[in-house]
């Protein structure tokens, strides 16, 4: 048996190639799969369940169809942190906490999106704290669709411009943050995304596995009792 992990697909109507690759992934055989975990940033942007576009509802239907075969779990990313119970219900995904612990074939394992590990990026962490305040989410939910989309587009533009000025080092998972979180939860293994740097890191605190993004290829982490297997395929298939 195996368990699959994906993340950072950044699905949008503007990238039909990614959407097609995701649908091919969902159409494969899952007979020997225990569960599928989506570790955030399933969508490029999400401004609220109440104004989900037809594209997103089609994706929800695709995911729901697979849910009849196996459980599907979702952890919020920094792009789709506003996905709520309404969308989870129609897509048949089970929402998990920001940091979730599972027993993965005998190994206590932490699952998370990964942006909380980039602690050297002080500016982003301040924004992240502000963004997660319940009152901020409440005010945002009361805005019109056009206003929410405008704010989201502005934030993405600022983030892209700001990231070009930051070193790759501060935008990666900080080793002490990784070690502290593993120690806090008494785990020796962690799986996350966000950084778009797929790799298997064997560190003193434990094993850290990073799932890749889907911008130029599909990226799937397969976990079995024998260990991890990071898989990548061209978006066009084959």
Swiss-Prot record:
It is found in: Cell inner membrane. Signal peptide: none annotated. It is a peripheral membrane protein. It comes from the Bacteria. The keyword Acetylation does not apply. Gene3D superfamilies: 3.60.21.10. Substrate binds at residues 78-79, 121, 159, 163, 166, 194. Binds 2 Mn(2+) ions per subunit in a binuclear metal center. Its EC number is 3.6.1.54. Mn(2+) 2 binds at residues 41, 78, 113, 194. It catalyses: UDP-2-N,3-O-bis[(3R)-3-hydroxytetradecanoyl]-alpha-D-glucosamine + H2O = 2-N,3-O-bis[(3R)-3-hydroxytetradecanoyl]-alpha-D-glucosaminyl 1-phosphate + UMP + 2 H(+). Its main location: membrane. Hydrolyzes the pyrophosphate bond of UDP-2,3-diacylglucosamine to yield 2,3-diacylglucosamine 1-phosphate (lipid X) and UMP by catalyzing the attack of water at the alpha-P atom. Involved in the biosynthesis of lipid A, a phosphorylated glycolipid that anchors the lipopolysaccharide to the outer membrane of the cell. This is UDP-2,3-diacylglucosamine hydrolase. The lineage of its organism: Bacteria, Pseudomonadati, Pseudomonadota, Gammaproteobacteria, Alteromonadales. The gene is lpxH.
